[in-house]
Swiss-Prot record:
Topology in the lipid bilayer: Multi-pass membrane protein
Protein name per UniProt: Protease HtpX homolog
Entry's Gene Ontology cellular component terms: plasma membrane
EC class: hydrolase
Gene3D superfamilies associated with the record: Metalloproteases ('zincins'), catalytic domain
Organism: Levilactobacillus brevis (strain ATCC 367 / BCRC 12310 / CIP 105137 / JCM 1170 / LMG 11437 / NCIMB 947 / NCTC 947)
Enzyme active site: 145
TM stretches of this protein: 16-36, 38-58, 159-179, 197-217
GO function terms (MF aspect): metalloendopeptidase activity; zinc ion binding
Length: 298
């Protein structure tokens, strides 16, 4: 059951990332057709923009994310011995280097991992999670976060964020061009054949829906990786009950005050406790009840 869940979630993640890439290139193609009458030119530009954004995000992600969430780094074991030793032990079990350790001064229990790869990873926990969870429960949470590190979820989330930002930049460029009449001038140079009209309609349709589709894809990726990290945490700790109890306590808590909205998908549970009508599409995390139900079957 455990390894089946891990394999299933990895496949789903592959589908989502493939969809992200296709969407980015499709937006580029649409822009190229609208403004330069060339699908290829736009696709190349979109690919370059996406790669540049990814490189910037990957190189700066840890410091930026920790700053946005008001996290302070713990550089010595004496500052938080229990937390330090738990992370050290889980890193050893997961066979990854010891990550940087951060604490967020917030009474709501929560935690997240970020970074580029296991060698440049960081784990942050709130003061609330250290106060409310016992050792067994905290071990389950740290196992979850170290699973994100081991499974390269931290890089996947960074890439997804970069692709979303690239799509937003391209769409913003298109909107400004339309506003100043650039696209109108380009269309004046074309004939009004059925093929050109269909191409224009498809391109405009893609540009309008792209940000929504990117958001849905990013949320789907986050949900799939949460399920995978839960299963991987059990693989590391051999104790599903610890994580189950931790999730129940985290769910039964107040929203965070220190969390940054752009980092919500990184946390082990939605830090703002959003109640979405269309949760399956726009929620950053799967329902806690569903996660617990899966853990109870292990």
């Amino acid at each position: 059951m455990l390894y089946d869940q891990i394999a299933t979630n990895k496949r789903r993640t592959g589908y989502v990332m493939f969809g992200f890439g296709v969407l980015t290139l499709a937006i580029g193609a649409a822009l190229g057709y609208l403004f330069w009458n060339s699908w290829v030119s736009g696709t190349v530009i979109a690919a370059v923009v996406a790669v540049v954004y990814m490189l910037i995000m990957i190189s700066q992600s840890t410091n930026v994310v920790m700053s946005m969430n008001h996290a302070r780094e713990i550089k010595d074991v004496s500052q938080a011995p229990q937390l330090w030793h738990l992370i050290e032990d889980m890193a050893l079990v997961a066979q990854v280097p010891m990550p940087r350790v951060f604490i967020i001064d917030d009474p709501s229990p929560n935690a997240f991992a970020t970074g580029n790869d296991p060698k440049h990873a960081a784990v942050a926990v709130t003061t609330g999670i250290m106060e409310r969870l016992n050792r067994e429960e905290l071990e389950g949470v740290i196992g979850h976060e170290m699973s994100h590190v081991r499974n390269y979820d931290i890089r996947l989330q960074t890439i997804a964020l970069a692709l979303s930002a690239a799509i937003g930049l391209l769409v913003n460029f298109a909107s400004n061009w339309f506003w100043w009449g650039g696209a109108t001038r380009r269309r004046d140079d074309r004939d009004d054949s059925a093929g050109n009209i269909i191409g224009l309609v498809i391109s405009i349709f893609l540009i309008i829906l792209a940000p929504l589709a990117a958001s849905i894809a990013q949320m789907a990726l986050s949900r799939n990786r949460e399920y995978l990290a839960d299963a991987s945490s059990v693989e590391l700790t051999r104790n599903p009950q610890g994580l189950i109890n931790a999730l129940r306590k985290i769910d039964d808590s107040q929203p965070m005050k220190a969390a940054d909205p752009n980092s919500a998908a990184l946390y082990i549970s939605d830090p703002f406790k959003h109640k979405q009508k269309f949760a399956d599409l726009f929620a950053t995390h799967p329902p806690i009840a569903d996660r617990i139900a899966r853990l109870e079957k292990m």
